[in-house]
Each structure stands twice: as structure tokens, then as C-alpha cells.
Amino acid sequence: MIELPEPDGTLAPYEPSTVPRGFTPSNAPFTSRVVFSTAHVVADPMAANTTLLLGFEPFRPPAIDWDATIAFRGHLWAQGFAVAEALDTQNRAMGLDWSASAELIRRSAQEAHAVGGRIAGGVWTDQLDPMRPHSIADITAAYEEQIEFVEGVGAQTIIMASPQLAQTAASPDDYAAVYRHLLAQATTPVILHWVLPESDPRLTGYWGHTDWDAALDAFAAVVKSNVDKVDGVKVWPVSREREIQLRRVMPEGVHVYNGDITDFPELIEGDEQGHSDALASVFGPLAPVIAGGFRALDAGDTETYRAELKSTLPLAQHLFEGDALSMRFFKTDFVFLAWLSGHQEHFRMIWGEQSARSVPHLAKAYRLADGLGLFPDADLAEHRMRLVLETAGIR
């Protein structure tokens, strides 16, 4: 028995699981849906990784434990997931600049090819100075540089929405011109990733409109005029109703990738008019249970699929708990659970984000994950949870 702290400061007894659920990786991708998971980056615990920047300190490249970082991707490929690399889960622009992101994509692509896994890499415009304005030509060239690199290492391209483009574009035509130029040059179909201002206010007015329906029409027009170059789209955060609307306006054959934390079981299962696929950050820490659900769906067992994925919702929502600012520290939970699960040997992070979640929050994550049987070694997980409690003065 272990006593876990509650948000009000009291301690509540909890009896950890003694026998973890059995998960047998199949090393084969899912067949019923395309399922991407992102994956966190493992920091080098012995290095002087910089603390959170205030905006005026010189940038210092992060020190990454590459072996542990790539090993976690191997865990995901073995479960059947494709891996989406160098997005916000990997500290993109929150510790990792383009140079570090490129190295991450290169190493992950090399390992993906070795094990037969699917890999995609995010392209952005983050090599541009964020403190000064840039022309459309500058932004286009930045995108082109990163696309050339990602394609060159054999990864699929995910084109992320650019804050610099949002700042510079004067009309919907400017957005359309940039994206059509990039898509015309792409050698393989890409994923278009549009983040809404609810998550990143810098992207307000993307596609030249602040109205959702008008922006969606402009976005869909770009996809429809380049349908042979678009594998799929991800828009986040969107409601259940808006994701279904997105599915209805996309051309046939273009995947709509879900990444939410509330309705993903139903949206991915779909309805008589179609379904979503997945490009989800939250699948990384939930991988064994999520994989079991998709294996059931592959076999036509929708009842087990629903039960497995719905069982993860309380933990998924807890990992992203908080307002728009604190929600960004979901990576702390991801690293914490990876450490408890034995995927890495320490609980240290780039920018010192291991301290970004409260001890009661981490304790609840432990309890929910243990309840799902996510820990391969329940005794190890309990021991490491006790270390966190002792560090906080809880004995």
C-alpha cells in the first residue's frame, strides 16, 4: 500500500496493481486505421540543459539522450504505430530548435527504415528569427529548406502552420500561393497540420480569416486543388462537430487525423459517412492499451475497441489538465510515465520541465496508469513513485 497526495494536501491510501496486463507487440502496423503517435525526447540527465528561457538569454542547444529517445520510438513501432516526429511533443520551439529537430528526424528516420516503421517529420519556419518580420519569399524558402531535409532522409512531411506566415500574409491568396508552391514541389503526399488560435494565438487569422467556416473553406480549397499531394490533414483543437464537418468537406482519399483527448474513440470509429484516422500526442503514454483497441478493430471487434479506448479517457484528459498555459506541460506527464514504465532511467527534462506538474497531479497520473495496467513492472513503478514522494517530503 502507498499513500498518495490529494489536491487538498491530504494523503489517501492506494493499493498498486500486482500483476500488469499482458501486452504482446505484433511489430505490424494497424490495418483498419492509419495511426500516428508522437513521442517525447529524453534529456541527457548529466548535462546542463538550460532552464525555461525568458526571451533574452542566448539559446543553448539541448543535450539529448539519443539512445533512450530512439528506443522509445522502437517501442511505438513494435506496438504498430507510425511515429510523427519533431512536433510540440518533442519540445519543438520549446527547447529544440530546427537544428536539433533535424537531427531528431534524421536519427528516427534511420531507425524507422531499419525496423520497417513509418515515420513523418514536422516542417515549420522556426529557423527564422522570431523577433523580426519576414517576407513571403523568406517564409517559403524556410519551409522549402525543411521539406528538402525531411524528404531527403526518407520521412513523410508534416507541414505545420507558420506564425511567421500568419504575421506576414495579407490575404487568403497569400496563404494559398505559399501552400500551392510547397505542395507542387513535394515528392510524396504530405500532411497539413493547422493549429487554431485557441492553442496558439499567433495563428489567429490563419488562411486569411478569423471566422471558422470561412477559414475552413479556404483550407479545403488548397487541399482540393492539390489533392494528389495531400495524404491528410490535422486541425487542432476542434470540437467533435467541427471534426465531422472537416471530414465532410475533404476530398475522398484525404485522411482526417484526429488528435483530441475527449472524443477520439467515437471519431476514429466513425459513422456511415466515414471515420477519422489518428495523429495523437496522447497515444504515446497509452500505447499498449490503445494498440490493443486497434488490433480489435482490425479484427472487426468494435466492442473491444470501444472498451479499450474509452478506458484511457480519464488518464488522457488528466495528462492534458489545465488552462492553455499549463496544458502545455503535458510532456512532463509523458516523461514521468515513461520513467515509471522503465523506458528511461531518470525523470529529468529539457528546460527543467520535470517540475512543471504538482506532486498530487503526478500521483493521480500514476494511479490512473496503474489502474490501466500500463506498467510492465508494477514494483518498479511503485518504487519510483515513492522516490518522487520522498523528494517532496512525503514519507
Give names to the regions the model predicted.
Residues 20, 60, 67, 85, ...:
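Generic preference for well-ordered secondary structure
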Residues 3-21, 26-213, 351-357, 372-395:
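Active-site beta->alpha loop and helix N-cap motifs at the rims of alpha/beta catalytic domains
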Residues 266-395:
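Structured C-terminal cap/extension of enzyme domains
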Residues 189-327:
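Catalytic alpha/beta core domains of metabolic enzymes, predominantly
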Residues 107, 181, 221, 292, ...:
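Alpha-helical scaffold segments in soluble metabolic enzymes
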Residues 37-38, 79-85, 153-157, 218-222, ...:
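Short amphipathic alpha-helical segments, especially helix-boundary/capping motifs
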Residues 65-68, 72, 100, 104, ...:
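General structural feature for long, well-ordered alpha-helical segments within catalytic domains
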Residues 1, 14-17, 28, 131-136, ...:
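Charged, low-complexity C-terminal accessory regions
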